[in-house]
């Protein structure tokens, strides 16, 4: 991918990094699911009678408990991997957006704006969620415990219902997919929050020497939530807050302190230098691809879509 030359291109570049992280999560969960299915198949092969395996058969001699101990250890190791993976993602999102935004501001203004590489302490403070219960380790720990309990329950319920291997494996598959979806949502939501934090920090430094305002830029497609469509194109001063119809109030997308605003938000924060808004923006087509169009607010784009 070519080097980003403006804030729109930079957002696409950073979003692609999050997408790649989501794909790595897919591989972690797919590998674990494959091993758990193999374990279930082994139980059926060793202890079933005429293809039927009862719950009593697997609890005898702690057979299921021993297998669940192994599953618990393996899933715990997986979540340590996920935590490391997501911490690296968040650090990349912050530092990349900070430095690349700094480059864009300096190239645009033709001035040295006094930027330096953020220290490890600054990055760590930015990465950590300010709400104690929503820090990455605590969120992933809740997801880990939930997944282990759900797998144990899925196997037990399937066997007590007299189901065969395929049905029990399908129960486990559904539980794993739900946990994967939560892990992906965590990566997307936290990645976006820290990504925007990097740009805000960069803009605060630039604003010491140039006139800057901030503008909400909604994702230009039909999946954008109604409240964020209304905020699209809204320009406010650096020290002001955005307010959404959902009750969120905050400095930027992903920082509205309201789950209905922040979870899986795809909006961007664009900085307006000397009152000049971007001339182009990226829109998503019906086939999922994107293209660059002349800058128009979301409401105007929506009218054009309905008329076409």
Curated annotation (Swiss-Prot):
GO terms for molecular function: DNA binding. It is found in: Virion. Keywords: Capsid protein, DNA-binding, Late protein, Virion. InterPro entries: Phage_head_morphogenesis_dom. Its main location: virion. GO terms for cellular component: viral capsid; viral procapsid. Monomer. Interacts with the portal protein gp6; this interaction targets gp7 to the procapsid portal vertex. Binds the viral DNA inside the capsid and the portal protein. May control the DNA exit from the virion. This is Minor head protein GP7.
